[in-house]
């Protein structure tokens, strides 16, 4: 009997230590998830958002440093206040949304991982793809694990949330976005932000 109890205790401990990571889905039916972008040139400041966010992330609350996943933004979902400017932005010279319908970041390695409570900060290295060009980038991220909070965002559903916040910049010319444009009018630096929450339903 004692041996049996010891075995059960070991199984319980082992299952806790090696618990499988959870998969979080970032396709938000509420349409709240968004990516932001800004090109702040001396003559014109272009600011916009994109709501067509999807993707999945594998996250283990017991081992946040092992996080992997891919976040995708639909190019056609990018919006700016000026409709003519938006038309140019989605056209062939800029993002060529018809030919390159997705912008993505695939996380591959987490470094400098620090966790306090349910919040983890880290530098994540991954592949950023824009207009068919892929480059390796390292960006700072903040992950907040919210156990049993899915119902607070989606009433009637049970599960957990993973909130991701990130901000980084890229060079427009590195991705063949409107090359040759006067930088006094269109900044070569594109500042990007990500404000999203993914669901892991139970």
Model-derived features: where do they sit?
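Low-complexity, acidic/polar, glycine-enriched regions of mature
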Residues: 19-202
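Gram-negative bacterial Sec-dependent N-terminal signal peptides
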Residues: 1-18
């Amino acid at each position: 009997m004692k041996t049996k109890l010891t075995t059960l205790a070991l199984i319980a401990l082992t299952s806790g230590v090696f618990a499988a990571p959870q998969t979080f889905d970032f396709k938000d039916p509420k349409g709240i998830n968004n990516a932001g972008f800004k090109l702040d040139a001396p003559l014109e400041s272009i600011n916009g958002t994109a709501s067509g966010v999807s993707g999945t992330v594998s996250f283990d609350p017991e081992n946040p440093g092992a996080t992997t996943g891919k976040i995708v933004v639909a190019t056609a979902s990018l919006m700016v206040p000026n409709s003519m400017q938006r038309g140019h932005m989605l056209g062939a010279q800029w993002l060529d949304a018809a030919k390159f319908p997705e912008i993505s970041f695939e996380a591959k390695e987490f470094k400098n991982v620090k966790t306090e409570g349910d919040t983890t900060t880290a530098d994540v290295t991954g592949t950023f793809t824009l207009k068919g060009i892929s480059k390796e980038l390292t960006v700072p991220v903040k992950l907040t694990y919210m156990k049993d909070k899915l119902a607070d965002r989606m009433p009637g559903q049970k599960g957990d949330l993973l909130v991701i916040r990130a901000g980084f910049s890229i060079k427009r010319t590195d991705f063949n976005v409107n090359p040759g444009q006067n930088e006094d009018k269109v900044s070569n630096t594109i500042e990007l932000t990500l404000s999203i929450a993914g669901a892991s339903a139970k």
